[in-house]
Amino acid sequence: MKIPSLYFFFFIQIAIILTIAAPSDDEPCKNGYLIEMSNHIECKCNNDYVLTNRYECEPKNKCTSLEDTNKPCADYARCLEDPYKDNKSNFYCLCNRGYIQYEDKCIQAECNYKECGEGKCVWDGIHEDGAFCSCNIGKVINPEDNNKCTKDGDTKCTLECAQGKKCIKHDVYYMCGNDNSGSGSGGGGGGGNSPPPSSGNSTLSLFNALNIVFLIAVIYII
């Protein structure tokens, strides 16, 4: 293989890692902590923070004044002003582009009408079947029930925790913490929860590991 080709693959691999790789020790889930369900990993926000995407939490705004406009006011939602209602300014939360309101929360538009049972719908833009179900820990996909989370089963934790931490089941998801972490509330991608004691923020996907090995090999050859 020619040297220019090696450099080309080198930079392509770096681009892939930076754009689609899940968070790791070098990409923390700021203002929250990583959780894992059966088919995906995402952030769960601390109190008074909300999700702006699967891996970012920002401060929650009350959405009561002009200062709050265009700022996060709920998971996947921003504050807007309606100056024409009742002849005075009114403020409301509107789901971000790509999300729609379902009951009292914003969900990905691709998940509209997608029933998952004991889990949640996820769309990552990569899964070949489009929107899919990610189950609460203790449940797995049931092929005989439209791939809903209605079958009992085990899911192996793939979170790589920081030194001194271990992967534990906390309510209906996995996280990094101590064995004596109390039971939490909610599961999946909701915000508004404080992290249990000693929660960790790191994960290392198999994809990242393989790319690191590839990069080391390329550098050695060069």
Curated annotation (Swiss-Prot):
Entry-linked PROSITE patterns: EGF_2
Coiled coil: none
Domain EGF-like per the UniProt entry, residue ranges: 29-58, 59-107, 107-150, 151-176
Taxonomic superkingdom: Eukaryota
Key words of the record: Cell membrane, Disulfide bond, EGF-like domain, Glycoprotein, GPI-anchor, Lipoprotein, Malaria, Membrane, Repeat, Signal
Paired cysteines (S-S): 63-79, 73-93, 95-106, 111-121, 116-133, 135-149
Membrane topology classification: Lipid-anchor; GPI-anchor
Residue numbers with lipid attached (GPI-anchor amidated glycine): 200
GO cellular component: plasma membrane; side of membrane
Record's protein name: 28 kDa ookinete surface antigen
Lineage per the UniProt record: Eukaryota, Sar, Alveolata, Apicomplexa, Aconoidasida
